[in-house]
């Protein structure tokens, strides 16, 4: 006789095993209509799942986040059924829900294209309208393998073979169609609703291995209602408008070419943006008590073997051999082992700790060409990397100090808020469980003492220690994980780093790995999209354009440009024999924040007409006042404080 405890604390008792549907109906017809699934003792399950023992139950309705994930998962199943009904013989593989949508991978001799989407979506809507119920069945393993093999579904059969022997083989039916799936699912296909859309196709290797067959991945998005779908599509349009690759072309910031895949050719304007950010970060680190260093890019494999990176990271490293010397070198994928070498060079005392060591370190990591994306995902990049060598008792103070610095930097760059995630031990890791217990405990205590609130991101720590991940939200609601702080007891042990303590004995330092931007390249991509290329004056690649209205004003335009340049501004002149409206349009497209318009009258009066990006009004000022005001506005925020 199960007793069901509801979220309000009330208890309902039943004479025998009950399903979630039965419990909802006992509460009222409104809940029975609204409930899509349920949590039983915290586990999300189908409404049809039987409850035989006492349990706490919470019903999931359409407004819950869990419902949205289930809508997306079920839409993937509807997609798979639609594809197989339209193209018999197509093999299905996997189809999970993902952020903002879902995908399903298919194996077919002829790949799908976006031209197939209208037919697929029409068939999907028919399946939704039919409202086939989702029904869970548990099959014997051998029977399930035979069934899928007989249907020519070799990928599904392989998945079943690889499941642990203890795991039940759950099959979900929706009408005549079925799929291998753990669930849970909604009540029926009608619960998916109509707020879905297929978005794109891509290639994907089976199980992510290039030695396996190439599959066609169809991506889609699904939402609770049409309003949410329309809002998402609008965000995508806005993301397209802000795409750093397009803006980079329009502003002449950088380019990428086949001869250097994954590496960036920075143009003069782009490099001005890069160095403005780097100079700002250098000042921030100097104020924060960091010492800047520089370490080699090519390092012998012996160091990577000692650090553990050779075993864990070799497939992502670029390797070079020196035949005459019988050496194997690697371009460094990260800076930390090299920083330990500087720490080890000479005798260190506890009086030197905490020792904060920073480097704008050039790193190289292999990424498959299909994973590269503009300047946001590349093979060669520069990190704002730093390592703090400290004692265990100093971790909390250094954590608090770093978080304050990070918050100030993000605010200066236009990001007012961020979230913190605590990433604990991954499955593949270095060090003993005892060491990880110690590191995780130290970081948790540091967060408590520093007043840092966080959410858990289980299993996502670095292979040598737990970490805090700092997540920015941009102007259109996207999250970007940029900053990190990692506690590492492993690398100092592996690389034999030590200091002489107050007791005159040798001790291991704790190593805090930290970054604020992550990589300059990726962060600049985020920054371009955050501002849609409309940078604050201090970051703008070209801060001011002086545009002449008539040819007679050209000498004065040059004089204005020289005055502004002497005031420290980055200035270009436009004295072409073109109409002023055409000049304004061109420089507005290039997102120049300030255009100074000068003609005969301005030349006679010693004035300039100031036009701001995106504005139609002009403000007339004397040249001296304009130079003073713009120079003050162009100061980086840290130099104004």
Curated annotation (Swiss-Prot):
Pfam families: HGTP_anticodon, TGS, tRNA-synt_2b, tRNA_SAD. Its EC number is 6.1.1.3. It is found in: Cytoplasm. HAMAP family: Thr_tRNA_synth. Catalyzes the attachment of threonine to tRNA(Thr) in a two-step reaction: L-threonine is first activated by ATP to form Thr-AMP and then transferred to the acceptor end of tRNA(Thr). Also edits incorrectly charged L-seryl-tRNA(Thr). The keyword Nucleus does not apply. GO terms for biological process: threonyl-tRNA aminoacylation. It comes from Gluconacetobacter diazotrophicus (strain ATCC 49037 / DSM 5601 / CCUG 37298 / CIP 103539 / LMG 7603 / PAl5). Keywords: Aminoacyl-tRNA synthetase, ATP-binding, Cytoplasm, Ligase, Metal-binding, Nucleotide-binding, Protein biosynthesis, RNA-binding, tRNA-binding, Zinc. One of its GO terms (molecular function) is metal ion binding. It comes from the Bacteria. Homodimer. Residues 1-61 form the TGS domain. Its cofactor is Zn(2+). It is an enzyme of class 6 (ligase). It catalyses: tRNA(Thr) + L-threonine + ATP = L-threonyl-tRNA(Thr) + AMP + diphosphate + H(+). This is Threonine--tRNA ligase.
């Amino acid at each position: 006789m199960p007793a069901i405890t509801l979220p309000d604390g009330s208890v309902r008792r039943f004479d025998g095993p009950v399903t979630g549907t039965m419990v909802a109906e006992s509460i009222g017809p409104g809940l029975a209509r609204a409930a899509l699934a349920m949590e039983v003792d915290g586990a999300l399950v189908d409404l049809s799942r039987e409850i035989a023992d006492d349990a706490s139950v919470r019903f999931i309705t359409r407004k819950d986040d869990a419902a949205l994930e289930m809508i997306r998962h079920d839409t993937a199943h509807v997609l798979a059924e639609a594809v197989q009904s339209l193209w018999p013989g197509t093999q299905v593989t996997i189809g999970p829900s993902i952020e903002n949508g879902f995908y399903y991978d298919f194996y077919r001799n002829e790949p799908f294209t976006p031209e197939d989407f209208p037919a697929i979506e029409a068939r999907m809507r028919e399946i939704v309208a039919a409202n086939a119920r989702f029904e869970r069945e548990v099959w014997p393993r051998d029977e399930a393998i035979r069934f899928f093999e007989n249907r020519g579904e070799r990928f599904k059969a392989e998945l079943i073979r690889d499941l642990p022997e203890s795991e039940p083989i759950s099959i979900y039916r929706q009408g005549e169609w079925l799929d291998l799936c753990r669930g849970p699912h909604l009540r029926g296909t009608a619960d998916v609703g109509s707020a879905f859309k297929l978005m794109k196709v891509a290639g994907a290797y089976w199980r992510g291995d290039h030695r396996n067959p190439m599959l066609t991945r169809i991506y889609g998005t699904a939402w609770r209602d049409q309003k949410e779908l329309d809002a998402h599509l609008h965000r995508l349009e806005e993301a397209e408008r802000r795409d750093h690759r397009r803006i980079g072309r329009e502003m002449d910031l950088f380019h990428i070419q086949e001869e250097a895949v994954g590496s960036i050719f920075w143009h003069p304007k782009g490099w001005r943006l890069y160095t403005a950010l780097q100079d700002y970060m250098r000042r921030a680190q100097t104020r924060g008590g960091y010492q800047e260093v520089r370490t080699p890019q090519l390092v012998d494999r012996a160091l990577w073997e000692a650090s553990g990176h050779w075993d864990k990271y070799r497939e992502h490293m670029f390797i070079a051999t020196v035949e005459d010397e019988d050496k194997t070198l690697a371009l460094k994928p990260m800076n930390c082992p090299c920083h330990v070498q500087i720490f080890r060079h000479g005798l260190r005392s506890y009086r030197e700790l905490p020792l904060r060591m920073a480097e704008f370190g050039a790193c190289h990591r292999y990424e498959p060409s299909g994973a590269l994306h503009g300047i946001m995902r590349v093979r060669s990049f520069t990190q704002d990397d730093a390592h703090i060598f400290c004692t265990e008792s100093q971790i909390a103070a250094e954590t608090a100090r770093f978080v304050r610095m990070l918050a100030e930097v993000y605010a200066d760059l236009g990001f007012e808020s961020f979230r913190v995630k605590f990433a604990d031990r991954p499955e593949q890791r270095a060090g003993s469980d005892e060491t990880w217990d110690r590191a995780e405990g130290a970081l948790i205590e540091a967060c408590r003492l520093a007043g840092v609130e966080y959410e858990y991101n289980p299993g996502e720590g670095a292979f040598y220690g737990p970490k805090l991940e700092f997540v920015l939200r941009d102007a259109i609601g996207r999250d970007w994980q940029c900053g990190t702080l990692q506690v590492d007891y492993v690398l100092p042990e592996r690389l034999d780093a030590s200091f002489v303590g107050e007791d005159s004995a040798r001790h291991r330092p704790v190593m805090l790995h930290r970054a604020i931007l992550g990589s300059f390249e990726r962060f600049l991509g985020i920054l371009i999209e955050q501002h849609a290329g409309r940078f604050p004056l201090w970051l703008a690649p070209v801060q001011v354009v002086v545009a002449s209205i008539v040819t007679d004003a050209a000498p004065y335009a040059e004089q204005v440009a020289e005055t502004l340049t002497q005031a420290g501004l980055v200035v270009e002149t436009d004295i072409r024999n073109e109409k002023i409206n055409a000049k304004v349009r061109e420089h507005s497209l290039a997102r120049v924040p300030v255009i100074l318009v000068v003609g005969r009258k301005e030349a006679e009066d010693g004035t300039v007409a100031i036009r701001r990006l995106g504005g139609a009004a002009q403000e007339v000022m004397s040249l001296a006042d304009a130079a003073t005001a713009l120079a003050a506005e162009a100061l980086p925020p840290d130099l104004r404080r």
